[in-house]
Amino acid sequence: MTAGPHRVVVLVFDGMKLLDLSGPAEVFSEANRFGADYRLSIVSADGSPVRSSIGMLVPADTDARAAAAHDTLVVVGGDALPGSPVGPVLGAAAKELAERAGRVASVCTGAFVLGAAGLLEGRRATTHWQHTATLARRCPS
């Protein structure tokens, strides 16, 4: 019996770091060159394109509610996350997508989105070294 594709949803938002999307996307693409079967889908909370931290518009394949079944959720980071609260719409989107994923991960400051969604409670997590103390204060459990 052959396993089907491993579906990965990447949650993006305005101000996200483009590297936090392109880096993991390249890793999954390289894995596919060596026989893996990863399928990437870019998701924003409402399905709208988002503007990255460098001003580039990133289209979303769909919104969080309509996202297809997936195995892994990856939440990208953004420079503003450590310094300001995560919006409730983004937090709700992360929570909804995480509830349907077998594995949840974040890149860099994306951990702040997971924390705001209550997804770090009782778990160990890390973020960019400059923001570990802030993450620990915001997500003490």
UniProtKB/Swiss-Prot annotation:
Q: Name one GO biological process term.
A: regulation of DNA-templated transcription
Signal peptide coordinates? none
Gene3D superfamilies in alphabetical order: 3.40.50.880
Q: Pfam families annotated for this entry?
A: DJ-1_PfpI (PF01965)
User: What family does this belong to?
Assistant: Belongs to the peptidase C56 family.
Record protein name field: Uncharacterized protein in cpoL 5'region
